[in-house]
């Protein structure tokens, strides 16, 4: 919605949105002179500009400023963020063909769906655009009208075509809405498998969740190898933003993890699995022997009753070792059987209790 705010602000100030920037995330207690000092240093490559206004954005608890560029500027020179005092300030700007490219993709999509632009506006509850007026409207105005229609339409507008990723920037000071890298990576690894689109579209959707250094890295790896896959992109993110834990450290951490007091064996195995996968990812443990290593560590690190020990020993001797789910099934079955036996023992009356149903009937 930041781009929509930029467009509305430019319209109010009667300035060209293609020659304007909006900088957000500025601490609320900053004076205009302090803001100018930071911007003059970080935006000096853009030439002369004019600060048109400042507003407070409640949802960010921070200020935003609008700048008008007074010289022709190479859009590639505009940074996506600047390092301000107290954190990163985001730079919002509009590319020259952003509206045209968007509308071209929109028209192509509507054609495939057998729909029209005017029909889409009607579905959104906006009656001001008809099939006769669409050809006469500029791309900029049409994009603006579409933004207005979507803003006032009932939610959700359409069923989700794909699950979106949470935001990740890789910045030293992450924004409140960002996920930690490990959480974002786990989510991304699973979700990209669900996207029923081409690799190129997957990379575009992945880039939509990125900001700052993370987005810069995405551009770098794609420029270096245009045919790079989404999985290879995620691998690059691991190399740059992932944990610095060494292979040896990952291996030792796994082998030194034991069942805790009061912890069920199944809970221990689940906790152990996270460490095993991390060790496999770092190639500290070969993937081909992961099942064997898992079984051996459970037998060494857990407190097992005799029945479960025998079952696991039998699985180890017979081979091949069970998978994670197969092992969990065996353990859960044994835990349920043990719990059932304990309940029966509690309910069974002790000798001498009850109504004497086993007394000899012939006794006087």
Curated annotation (Swiss-Prot):
Residues 335-353 have a biased composition (Acidic residues). Keywords: Acetylation, Nucleus. The modification N-acetylalanine is found at residue 2. GO terms for cellular component: nucleolus. Disulfide bonds: none annotated. It is found in: Nucleus, Nucleolus. InterPro entries: PNMA, PNMA_C, PNMA_N. Residues 335-364 are annotated as: Disordered. Belongs to the PNMA family. This is Paraneoplastic antigen Ma2 homolog.
């Amino acid at each position: 919605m930041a781009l929509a705010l930029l467009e509305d602000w430019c319209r109010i100030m009667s300035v060209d949105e293609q020659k304007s920037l909006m900088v957000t995330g500025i601490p609320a207690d900053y004076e205009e002179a302090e803001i100018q000092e930071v911007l003059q240093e970080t935006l000096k490559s853009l030439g002369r500009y004019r600060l048109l206004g400042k507003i407070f954005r409640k949802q960010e608890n921070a200020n935003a400023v609008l700048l008008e560029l007074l010289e022709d500027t190479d859009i590639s020179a505009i940074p996506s963020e600047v390092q301000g005092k107290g954190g990163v300030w985001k730079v919002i700007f509009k590319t020259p063909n952003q509206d045209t490219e968007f509308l071209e993709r929109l028209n192509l999509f509507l054609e495939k769906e057998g729909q029209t632009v005017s029909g889409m506006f009607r579905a959104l509850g906006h009656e001001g655009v008809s099939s006769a007026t669409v050809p006469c409207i500029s791309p900029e105005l049409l994009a603006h009208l579409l933004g207005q229609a979507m803003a006032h339409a009932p939610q959700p507008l359409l069923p989700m075509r794909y699950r979106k990723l949470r935001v990740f920037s890789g910045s030293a000071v992450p924004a409140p809405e960002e996920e930690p890298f490990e959480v974002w990576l786990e989510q991304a690894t699973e979700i990209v498998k669900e996207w029923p689109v081409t690799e190129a579209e997957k990379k575009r959707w992945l880039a939509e969740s990125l900001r700052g250094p993370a987005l810069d890295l995405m551009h770098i790896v794609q420029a270096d190898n245009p045919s790079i896959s989404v999985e290879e992109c995620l691998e690059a993110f691991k190399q740059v933003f992932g944990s610095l834990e060494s292979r040896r450290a990952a291996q030792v951490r796994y082998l030194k993890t034991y069942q805790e007091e009061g912890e069920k064996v199944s809970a221990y195995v689940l906790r152990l699995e996270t460490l095993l996968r991390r060790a496999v990812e770092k190639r500290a443990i070969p993937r081909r022997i992961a099942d064997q290593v898992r079984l051996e560590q459970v037998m060494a690190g857990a407190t097992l009753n005799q029945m479960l020990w025998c079952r696991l020993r039998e699985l180890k001797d017979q081979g091949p070792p069970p998978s994670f789910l197969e092992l969990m099934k065996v353990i859960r079955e044994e835990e349920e059987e043990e719990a059932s036996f304990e309940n029966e023992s509690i309910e069974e009356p002790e000798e001498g209790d009850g109504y004497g149903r086993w007394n000899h009937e012939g006794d006087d």
